[in-house]
Amino acid sequence: MRQAKDVLEVMEHVLRLKRFNRSGWCYYGVFSPESIADHSFSVSFLAMLLVEFFKDRGYEVDEARVMKMAVLHEIGESRLGDLQLDARRLLGMEHISRVERRAVSEILEAFPELSKLWNEFEDGETVEALIVKIADKLELLLQALDYEKRGARNLDKIFGDSENRKNFSKLPFIEEFVEGICKSRGEK
């Protein structure tokens, strides 16, 4: 049986996410960038909207699993910090994945069912995991668009990097969102 200390220990990690800025925005010179917790909230909200979007189109989606995955998706960064994409590539994506899996397993040791959900997200093989992975990347593009509207420059690489559009082709209709974002940027 879990104890109060188990909950409190996990919450120590969650609270760290409020203090860590998303490193990619710092790398690109964005003034006052969002925290990892800010990002996680936006991803969770977008994932909730995407669940409704896909349900409207006849998909069966387990909303609770999507929401839990969305809330959990960055928990490993409470131990590792947020690694900017170029740093991830330099260190090796597979290596980062192994280390992050270990960190999440340790953080959620008293909550193995949540650790299992995080691993499902990381594997990206279920509709629920894909919705969260896509929400994660769409949120990145939306945040970049918001920063551009507020005067940030030099964010073109974020929009053009294929890693930031990973998994988009695995679910239908996602290009509609990308087209809407590009249109808002003034792209054709």
Give residue ranges: language-model regions.
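Alpha-helical, largely C-terminal catalytic domains
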Residues: M1-K188
